[in-house]
Design a protein with these regions (language model features):
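Detector for outer-membrane/organellar transmembrane beta-barrel domains
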Residues: 7-124
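Flexible, solvent-exposed loop segments that connect beta-strands
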Residues: 39-43, 165-170
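Outer-membrane beta-barrel biogenesis signature
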Residues: 76, 95, 144-151, 187-189
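Flexible, surface-exposed loop regions and adjacent strand-edge segments
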Residues: 82-86, 132-134, 169-177
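A C-terminal functional module that forms or caps the active site or interfaces directly
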Residues: 119, 131-144, 150-154
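Outer-membrane beta-barrel "beta-signal"
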Residues: 137-143, 172-189
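C-terminal beta-signal and adjacent terminal beta-strands/loops
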Residues: 143, 155-164
Length: 189
């Protein structure tokens, strides 16, 4: 085979019960990739490392979380996908050269089926320094009874602002990104 990527990933998780209804959960992700063969590029790094973690406090009403991530070298996503860290945004770059991303958020459960999410994010890094801020808002509803039991509706809106000196779209980007998904899980017996 003339095109190979060697990849290793590890996830460590630990949950600590604080009370019958409260837990603290820590997650740490480590990832390393190295390109061999046709994917190697003389003008770009042929290896990268990613470290990312999240700390979540779970309560009966929802959860509060904080996460962070760091990517050493950006790589072509068709060769190696490094967009796997815990800080989440629909569109803000978290996957560039020397990039850091930090996020704090809350998930609030209005009912057992309906959850709201609010999660600001901050990013820094890249060859041409990108400084981004964003706010992710989301709603999730899961149908719990009737013929559509198991159907899940998800709607998220991301408000992003980035400072990218020299960007073809301008030095300051100010945008909305909206995503909706409908998922229906079922089992054949």
């Amino acid at each position: 085979q003339k095109d190979v990527s060697n990849q290793i990933q590890s996830i460590l998780e630990k949950s600590i019960p604080l009370d019958p209804n409260y837990t603290l959960k820590g997650e740490l992700l480590g990832f390393y990739a190295q390109l061999e063969g046709l994917s190697r590029n003389t003008s770009q790094p042929n290896e990268t490392a990613l470290v990312s973690g999240q700390l979540t406090w779970n309560a009966p009403w929802g959860s509060v979380f904080g996460s962070g991530g760091y990517l050493r070298h950006a790589m072509n996503g068709a060769v190696v996908d490094t967009d796997i860290g815990y800080p989440f945004s629909l569109s803000l770059d978290r996957n560039r050269e020397g990039m850091q991303s930090w996020q704090l958020g809350v998930n609030y459960r209005l009912t057992p089926q309906f959850t709201l999410t609010f999660a600001p994010i901050v990013t820094r890094g890249y060859d041409v320094r990108i400084e981004g801020t964003g706010i992710l808002g989301g709603m999730n509803y899961r149908v719990s009874e009737g013929p559509l039991q198991g159907m899940n509706f998800f709607l998220a809106a991301d408000k992003g602002r980035e400072k990218r000196d020299g960007s073809t779209l301008g030095d300051r980007l100010n945008y909305w990104d909206v995503k909706m998904s409908i998922q229906y899980d079922f089992m054949l017996k």
